[in-house]
UniProtKB/Swiss-Prot annotation:
Sequence ranges of Low complexity compositional bias: 216-225, 302-322, 520-538, 646-665
Pathway given in the UniProt record: Protein modification; protein ubiquitination
Protein name: Probable E3 ubiquitin-protein ligase IRF2BPL
Highest taxon of source: Eukaryota
Region annotation Disordered: where it falls in the sequence: 172-345, 513-554, 583-669
Biased amino acid composition, Polar residues: 605-619
Cross-link (Glycyl lysine isopeptide (Lys-Gly) (interchain with G-Cter in SUMO2)): K79
Compartments reported by the entry: Nucleus
PANTHER family: E3 UBIQUITIN-PROTEIN LIGASE IRF2BPL-RELATED, MYELIN TRANSCRIPTION FACTOR 1-RELATED
Gene Ontology MF: a single term: ubiquitin protein ligase activity
Gene, per the UniProt record: IRF2BPL
Biased composition annotated in UniProt, kind: Gly residues: 230-246
Compositionally biased region (Pro residues): 282-291, 593-602
Length: 794
């Protein structure tokens, strides 16, 4: 006998489904042998009722176990008793009544099926139920339909739609058993206990099945693993026939796949997180029901058909970012966004690097450029910043804040403009086409298309709030961008506007130095340049600090910002007196130098022209802050086109400490006495040149620089070299030659604290503590081989 024949002979037919089963798959605890599948399908609490109904139908229709293998042999001594005619008639009558009831139930179900036909069709499209998991009753109608169970199966299938709104673990109170009322509560898989049977009480003892089938738990677990995570039934379905009848128990293979994968609450698309790039919004998900959108099940909004199990990271990421265009699920949605974000960061870093390079080299490069290029840049720079917007979507705003001219070897100069978009975001674009492309992508959600010329898609506002928007290409036509023609007339130039909500320009983040803005109400001096380099430097520095002092927080480092605020608080009054009491007029620019840029307009009226470009300010403390960007040791002399000294151009910044002379030749950074700020000092020979930090109003009339007189030692009144002398950081008029400083140090004693050579204990800025020389400074001043060159008479 072959193995197949042996296996076939061992199989037994289930009383309900009529399919051959192995002995371990059969359950003998009921009146008829049934398989575990039928018990799980019908439920352990009503399987006896189904067996009885099937028995009556079989007797009525003559469907007996003719070709089936017999069940377990009856015990020895028990004889099979044939039914009498009276019993057969009673059974036939009962079967007829059951058949009539089943027929009536089928009619009711057909009406409900017609009403829910559309809904079921939609479910079939959305829910890809595996065909192999469909119950045998659908594949073989000759099985259960002839037993009258098709009505219950159809009712369960029709009621599956109502379950879609319920979570997998949301179960109603346990249904009342049809056979008895003593069953325990049902488990989440729809069964009353282990193996689908109620858990026995201690008085009842273990059920018979546990004694006969010790491996039933593992068998049930294997069935559950083959069927997926839902090895049992899902209860809680309302009775499709209405009324207060018992709730149905539906097998998992009749439920939509979305309900088996996870709870309905997990299917709701969460709001997407805010985008990392500026104010650009995230992709808008498709509307419910649309291809690729979160289709709603059963007409209930908020329940997505794309939900997945909680452990499925791929599906959850798709639910977060939405479904891709065209109804397709992109395989790497998150990776695509990450790549795009990474490219955007790289592009912004490159643009900031270009801006930093432009600001760093502007002083030298602009002075060496042709006159047409220089004049155009100065004119355009005097109009910044001003707002621009996208022509097709007026809500997309940016601002132009800087210009430059670039050229490749053998090529003509071409205008480069720097645009911040969105306004206040810090994202910098170095071309009009780049920002126009980004605006187009934000507007149209098209990441693949580029624009030919950004000047055709950008508009600028001539005056803020006027509503007079003009095409940027009209202001900057191709002839102007290549410096073939000059900038159009003044009627085309925009007026500068600085938004109070986002005053910090990207130039403040990359510029090497910033001049603190003057207090509100301070007048603006027209810039004057003693040389071409000075004019370009003044333009760069004016551009580097457009923000008012009360709104500069957030973009600078905390320490630097605190020093700036302290510096401005101490210098505000002195700065006013420097410009008002002095009453200087701006001298004309040097011959051959570039013309001065136009005075700032609009909100720029409260800005202060850097003192380096206006040497009439004399020892203005702003020079100390501005001169860091200049090359060390290149201070302007009186021969550079101005009759006044520009010693302040070589003054070094110090906000809260005495400024010391250089301790060693060459460029060196000396730590200040209180360690707050590194001090940059440099002349090539050993020198003592402290930078100025505080301007006392009462000392301004006595200052040689303010009076346009020569530099003289305060003690011996000898003329000083304009870059080599000892400067008191507190009192501008305290200037000393090296011999007098040397004598003062020796008189005070070099081993102790050495104060100002004037004999006074000049206090530090903002405190009563006097400043004193550092040991390195003392050693430099006491060096005997230092020969100081005296200034000759003009």
């Amino acid at each position: 006998m072959s193995a197949a024949q042996v296996s076939s002979s061992r199989r037994q037919s289930c009383y309900l489904c009529d399919l051959p089963r192995m002995p371990w798959a059969m359950i003998w605890d009921f009146s008829e042998p049934v398989c575990r599948g039928c018990v799980n399908y019908e439920g352990a609490d009503r399987i006896e009722f189904v067996i009885e109904t099937a028995r009556q139908l079989k007797r009525a229709h003559g469907c007996f176990q003719d070709g089936r293998s017999p069940g377990p042999p009856p015990p020895v001594g028990v004889k099979t008793v044939a039914l009498s005619a009276k019993e057969a008639a009673a059974a036939a009558a009962a079967a007829a009544a059951a058949a009539a009831a089943a027929q009536q139930q089928q009619q009711q179900q057909q009406q409900q099926q017609q009403q829910q036909q559309q809904q079921q069709q939609q479910q079939q499209q959305l829910n890809h139920v595996d065909g192999s998991s469909k119950p045998a009753v659908l594949a073989a109608p000759s099985g259960l339909e002839r037993y009258g169970l098709s009505a219950a199966a159809a009712a369960a299938a029709a009621a599956a739609a109502a379950v879609e709104q319920r979570s997998r673990f949301e179960y109603p109170p346990p249904p009342v058993s049809l056979g008895s009322s003593s069953h325990a509560t049902r488990l989440p898989n729809g069964l009353g206990g282990p193996n689908g049977f109620p858990k026995p009480t201690p008085e009842e003892g273990p059920p018979e099945l546990n004694r006969q089938s010790p491996n039933s738990s593992s068998a049930a677990a294997s069935v559950a693993s083959r069927r997926g995570t839902h090895g049992g039934l899902v209860t809680g379905l309302p009775n499709p026939g209405g009324g207060g009848g018992p709730q149905l128990t539906v097998p998992p293979n009749l439920l939509p796949q979305t309900l088996l994968n996870g709870p309905a609450s997990a299917a709701v698309l969460p709001p997407p997180p805010p985008h990392a790039l500026g104010s650009r919004g995230p992709p808008t998900p498709a509307p419910p029901g649309a291809p690729g959108g979160p289709a709603c099940l059963g007409g209930t909004p908020g329940v997505s058909a794309t939900s997945s199990s909680a452990s499925s990271s791929t599906s959850s990421s798709v639910a977060e970012v939405g479904v891709g265009a065209g109804g397709k699920r992109p395989g790497s949605v998150s990776s695509t966004d990450q790549e795009r974000e990474l490219k955007e960061k790289q592009r912004n870093a490159e643009a900031l690097a270009e801006l930093s390079e432009s600001l760093r080299n502007r002083a030298e490069e602009w002075a060496n450029k042709p006159k047409m290029v220089r004049d155009t840049l100065l004119t355009l720079a005097g109009c910044t910043p001003y707002e621009v917007r996208f022509k097709k979507d007026h809500s997309l705003l940016g601002r132009v804040f800087a210009f430059d001219a670039v050229s490749k070897p053998g090529m003509d100069y071409e205008l480069k403009l720097f645009i911040e978009y969105p306004t206040g975001s810090g994202n910098v674009y170095s071309s009009a086409s780049g920002v126009a492309k980004q605006m187009y992508q934000d507007c149209m959600k098209d990441f693949g298309r580029g624009l030919s010329s950004g000047f055709k898609y950008l508009e600028y506002e001539k005056k803020h709030g006027s509503g007079d928007w003009r095409l940027l290409g009209d202001l900057l036509p191709e002839a102007v961008r290549f410096f073939k023609e000059g900038v159009p007339g003044a009627d085309m130039l925009p007026q500068p506007y600085l938004d109070a909500s986002c005053p910090m320009l990207p130039t403040a983040l990359v510029s090497l130095s910033r001049a603190p803005s003057a207090p509100p109400g301070t007048g603006t001096l027209p810039p004057a340049a003693p040389s071409g380099r000075g004019a370009a430097a003044s333009l760069r520095k004016r551009k580097a600090s457009p923000e008012p002092p009360d709104s500069a927080e957030g973009a600078l480092k905390l320490g630097e910002e605190q020093q700036r605020q302290q510096w401005m608080a101490n210098q505000s009054e002195a700065l006013k007196l420097t410009m008002s009491a002095g009453g200087f007029a701006a001298p004309g620019h040097a011959a051959g130098g570039p013309p001065p840029p136009p005075p700032p307009l609009g909100p720029h009226s409260n800005r202060t022209t850097p003192p380096e470009s206006a040497p009439q300010n004399g020892p203005s403390p702003m020079a100390a802050l501005m001169s860091v960007a200049d090359t060390l040791g290149t201070a302007h002399s009186p021969k550079d086109g101005s009759s006044v000294h520009s010693t302040t151009a070589s003054a070094r910044r110090n906000s809260s400490s005495p400024v010391s002379p250089a301790s060693v030749p060459g460029q060196r950074r000396l730590a200040s006495r209180n360690g707050d700020l590194n001090l940059q000092v440099a002349p090539p020979p050993p020198s003592a040149h402290p930078g100025m930090d505080q301007v006392h109003p009462q000392n301004i009339p006595d200052s040689p620089m303010a009076n346009s007189g020569p530099l003289c030692c305060t003690i011996c009144h000898e003329r000083l070299e304009d870059t080599h002398f000892v400067q008191c950081p507190s009192v501008p008029s305290h200037k000393f030659c090296f011999p007098c400083s040397r004598e003062s140090i020796k008189a005070q004693g070099a081993s102790g604290e050495v104060y100002c050579p004037s004999g006074e204990k000049c206090p530090l800025v903002g405190s009563n503590v006097p400043w004193a020389f550092m040991q390195g400074e003392i050693a430099t001043i006491l060096a005997g081989d230092v020969k100081v060159k005296k200034e000759r008479d003009p």
